[in-house]
Structures are given as C-alpha cells and as structure tokens.
Amino acid sequence: DYSEGAHPSVLEAISEHNFETTCGYSMDPFCRHTADTVRELTDCPDADVHFIVGGTLANTIVISAALRPWEGVIAATTGHINVHETGAIESSGHKVCAIEATDGKLTPALVRKVMRIHCDGKDEHMVLPRMVYISDATELGTIYTKAELAALYEVCREYDLYLFLDGARLPAALVAQGNDLDITDFGKYCDAFYIGGTKNGLLFGEALVITNDSLKPHFRNMIKQRGGMFAKGFLFGVQFDAYFKDGLWLDMARHAVTQAQRIAKAAQEKGYTLYAQSPTNQVFVVLSHEKIAELEKNFAFEAFGHVDDDHEAMRFVCSWATKPEAVDALIE
C-alpha cells in the first residue's frame, strides 16, 4: 500500500502550491490549518499535532520522548516495533518488552502478565515498563474493538502506563467490516496516536496526535534530534489538507479494503486457508511452495510466516490504487 505514488488530488494540491514561499519545519499556514483540521476531526481541541515522514520514525520519536532511560515499552511479539524496525527502539536505549498475543492484539491480561514479570516496576534491577504500544490495524491485519481499546486504556491507567497507538494503517481499520471505533475514540483512549498517510495515498506523512499533556513539552526538540524535522514541512500540510477534504482518506481506504477482501473471499472459495482473519487491506494466504513459485511469475507479494515444510503464509496488500482487473487476474 506504499507501492504507488500519491492520489491525483494530492499531487494536484502540491502542484497548485508549488511556487508559494512558506516557513520551514511545519511552521507554515498549511500545517497550522491542517493541524486544526485534525483536532476537529478527532475531537481533541487541546491536542498537539505533529507531522512525521513515516511510521518507524514516528514510533521512535514518540517512544524516545515518553520514556526515561531505564523504561521500556510493552508490545506484541508481532508488533512492528519488535520485528520490522531493525531495532530502532532498542537503538534509542529502550527495551521492547514483547509478549505473545493472539491475532497480534494485546489484552489487559497480557499487560498484567508483563508487569508481573517485571515485578510491577518495583525492581530497580529490571527494565520498568512505562508504555503499551499497539497498532490498528495490527501486523496481522486484525482490528481492535472499542471495548478492547477502552479496556487497555483502563489497565494502562492502573499501572501508570502510556498507551500509544501506531496508526499507519488506521484508515483501513476504520472502514473494515466489524469495526466499531470512530476516529474520535482514539483521543479518548490513547495518550498519543497517529493517522497514517504514507500507506493510504500520500507521498509520505503521518499525522501524530498527542493528547497527554505530559508528553507535549519540548516534543519538537525530540523530532529534531531524531532526524524527523522535515525542512519542507509545508508539504505535510498541503497533502493532508487534500487528504481530509470530502473524506478522501476514507474513500481511498475503502477501495483498498474492498479489493483485498475480494482476494480473501476468492482464496477461501478455492479451498485455501487464511493465516489470519484480516478484514483490512492485508490478506494472508497459506500457499504451497509450488503455488508460490507459480504466482511469483506475475505477481508481487511477501512471505510472512512459515507454516510447515510444504507451506508458507504469504501477504497480499491492496492500496488506494489497486486496479480491480489486477485482482481479477490474481483470483483467476
């Protein structure tokens, strides 16, 4: 879902404002306007809004800013920060306290288990968990319900933990069948979260929303120190303004999810097993080595997990730009 450029409306907006002279580092009128749009959209009038180029950088900056040197972050073993960020969090000096989670989703019971392992944060010889990291959708394409998110928020309050939500694929989660979360719910139940754009039709960009006042001071200093202070920041504002206009961001996500679910439905009808029950724009299909070799001649997809000596789980991802006829060809 980051394999194409950007939606034509986004490119048109960039072209329209290309020769305008603005302040750098997201201090321009476009970013200020779009930040206000995000506050209104999320019903977080007092939130700080920052724009970051991509997900790994956003995760690293938020976690680095929130944690003291002896503190760590709880995540599922399949969590992006644990397996797909090349140790970015650890390189900043913070341990990822990973735990096995069904369908990639953390629960209050799992958080409590990690806290017990770490002596509820009372042993100075151990890392002190201080944050819970989740993503919606998860790495397995699964989504959280409102009740699940609220329950995680409550256990985080119980243990004085921050709850941080990676929203790189949040648009896809919001339009997925079975979702009961509204964009306004994340401001209620998360200390920080972001709305992904890179994987949903922007050239680049994640809109980070910080609701917890304790995380706000000097956050731009951390952005700069971690290499995230984008000089041509006005491009964030211009892109996201087009993104949110007339619900384009959700329309793009719906297209991606619709095409992906066509693949999921067809795979099951043809007798294939799904590795994970994902209602989003990611589909995980268990395939034989022979079928993988056959499909690789004409299609691009990714190995996701080993199943047995003869089968692997393969990940197929659709985007805002996936052509229905391409899905037809894969199904055939």
Where are the model-predicted features located?
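Conserved PLP-anchoring active-site segment centered on the Schiff-base-forming lysine
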Residues: 65-83, 112
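Conserved C-terminal alpha-helix-loop-beta "cap" of PLP-dependent enzymes
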Residues: 69-70, 261-331
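Active-site C-terminal subdomain of aminotransferase-like
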Residues: 102, 128-130, 135-138, 143, ...
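Catalytic PLP-binding core of fold-type I/II PLP enzymes
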Residues: 144-176
